[in-house]
Amino acid sequence: MGIRYYRPYTAGTRQKTSSDFAEITRDRPEKSLVKAKHRAKGRNNRGVITSRRRGGGHKRRYRIIDFYRNKLGVPGTIATVEYDPNRNARIALVNYKDGEKRYILHPRNVQVGTTIVAGPDAPIEVGNALPLERIPLGTEVHNVELIPGKGGQLARAAGALAQVVAKEGKMVTLKLPSGEVRLFQKECYATIGQVGNVESNNITIGKAGRNRWKARRPKVRGSVMNPVDHPHGGGEGRAPIGRSGPVTPWGKPTLGYKTRKKKKQSNKLIVRRRRRSSKRSRGGRQS
């Protein structure tokens, strides 16, 4: 993938960049692997907003992705590389030898015509899926299962990868994209290689309208609201928030406040915590 730059014909194109889509080989999805997608626009079943700043955006159809990779021992050939509006990674259509078709996340540098296979005896090649116990130390993987048979849940975004760093007994240690080092059951499956479209993080939106196409609505600072709408609101002109630290619209501490349960079961599987976010609690920060 490359990044396309634009001449500043308008204010919206001055800073804008986008993908050149050079890796895309087909512009229409496989009909049998597409279904309608209802978008909740941030509302729950009662119509109450539970996730702010969602709504609008372009209509999408959902591509059914095979995160399970459970066609063991059946080879498949990469037929196409396609755009998926529901994720920043590309997807690849796989034609299996038994006639079935499935979409998978497109691994980096995998070309049309490449043969892939899943199973404990699969070769260590990019695009193949194996149990973690069969993957050599130092190997980069993606689409990692948290629970055997549940399907890949980790390292699925564009450019994401995890690394196998140790094996001991029934557990395998992986370093995740967040920097967290965590234990996994050795039976969990993962796919060899890195997710494609690695330049996705370097794209500049350029104008507000592109975010609206993605159903992302504007984010209003609490400090410019009225007191009835936000704890940071009110005051004459640009007033401080009047608290020891920033809070959410419902009065809960935010920006650096730990929300993970202290007695969560999976705590014992975490060897090293993820890197701390740059959004830490500071007096002048607004939410």
From Swiss-Prot:
Q: Name one GO molecular function term.
A: transferase activity
Ordered alphabetically, the record's keywords are: Ribonucleoprotein, Ribosomal protein, RNA-binding, rRNA-binding
Q: Where is the composition biased (Basic residues)?
A: 209-220, 258-287
Is Ribonucleoprotein found in the keyword set? yes
An example GO CC term for this entry is: large ribosomal subunit
Highest taxon of source = Bacteria
Listed transmembrane segments? none
State the family named in the UniProt similarity comment for this chain: Belongs to the universal ribosomal protein uL2 family.
According to its UniProt entry, the function of this protein is described as: One of the primary rRNA binding proteins. Required for association of the 30S and 50S subunits to form the 70S ribosome, for tRNA binding and peptide bond formation. It has been suggested to have peptidyltransferase activity; this is somewhat controversial. Makes several contacts with the 16S rRNA in the 70S ribosome.
Q: How does it assemble?
A: Part of the 50S ribosomal subunit. Forms a bridge to the 30S subunit in the 70S ribosome.
Its recorded name reads Large ribosomal subunit protein uL2
Which organism's genome codes for this protein? Acaryochloris marina (strain MBIC 11017)
Q: Recite the lineage of the species.
A: Bacteria, Bacillati, Cyanobacteriota, Cyanophyceae, Acaryochloridales
Point out the gene that encodes the protein: rplB
